[in-house]
Regions:
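Non-catalytic cap/lid and distal C-terminal segments of serine-dependent acyl enzymes
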Residues: 1-272
């Protein structure tokens, strides 16, 4: 596998930014065999949480080792604490993730597949909410969405935030992102994640498959239950929604385990 750190200028963000890229490579190293798809690489867009940056998945998990035998390309962007939304008082991170970055990467990496069925978007915590936000707003671009320990989504913060001991910090972040410190007041608006789940199912016939995993001791567990209920109340399960839970709090032990389980569902076998 090739590991790349890419610095470039984003027109949408109007500033320089960074991504980490794991590139498939047919190779045999000590303790690791790599695989490369013959024609094009399937892509995992892997999103970080609120306190992290583009390097976090590479530093806290063995994502390169997990992707190697699958011939899977992994792209890890950086979006500060934006929740992957076009911020009211900040950069347009949604436009960057959903449009600008894929176009840039397609030019830089010609073997990167642009097929919907070959593009997966996943993340932890804020990144799980971001995967849902970006994926559900673009069901024609992503075949699968993976949410791990999703918590930072409107209008569900009241279910856990007061237990976190960081209420002031989240209020300030919300002002930058939404233009209001009270994200619960956004129920029924364009930012309402439950409304987005329902509206996307009504408006589109082709939908991404949803993989959702949550730790049973995670303080954000009640948020996961509301999201789960919303998906399961849609007749016919058009998202093919799949929910899993297991022991764990809001930590990397859980995310490292469950990103592997998600990759197993992709049934990728790599190239020859």
């Amino acid at each position: 596998m090739a590991l790349l750190h890419v610095n470039f200028h984003s027109k949408v963000l109007n500033m320089d930014t960074k991504i980490g890229v794991i590139m498939p490579q047919k190779m045999q190293g000590i303790g690791l065999a790599g695989s490369e798809q013959a024609d094009s690489f399937p892509v995992l867009w892997l999103l970080h949480g609120r306190s992290d940056d583009y390097t976090i998945w590479m530093r806290r998990t063995s994502i390169e080792r997990y992707a190697a035998p699958l011939g899977l390309m992994v792209i890890m962007p950086e979006v500060s604490y934006s929740r992957y939304i076009n911020m009211k008082h900040g950069p347009r991170y949604y436009d960057y993730i959903s449009k600008d970055l894929p176009e840039f990467c397609a030019k830089l990496f010609p073997k990167m597949s642009r097929k919907r069925e070959d593009n997966y978007i996943a993340g932890l915590s804020m990144g799980g909410g971001g995967a849902m936000w970006v994926g559900l707003n673009n069901p024609d671009k992503y075949g699968r969405i993976c949410m791990l320990s999703t918590g930072g989504v409107a209008p569900l913060e009241h279910l856990w935030r007061n237990k976190s001991g960081s209420d002031y910090m989240f209020k300030k972040c919300n002002e930058d992102i939404y233009g209001t410190s009270d994200s619960d007041s956004l129920a029924g608006t364009e930012y309402d994640i439950l409304k987005l789940i329902q509206d996307t199912a009504k408006e589109h016939t082709v939908l991404p498959k949803i993989y959702h995993a949550m730790g049973t001791e995670d303080v954000r567990y009640p948020v996961a239950m509301e999201i789960k209920k919303t998906f399961e109340n849609i007749p016919g399960n058009p998202y093919e929604y799949e929910y899993h839970e297991g022991p764990g709090v809001h930590e990397w032990v859980f995310w490292d385990e469950w990103i592997q389980h998600f990759l197993d569902t992709l049934a990728l076998k790599g190239g020859n």
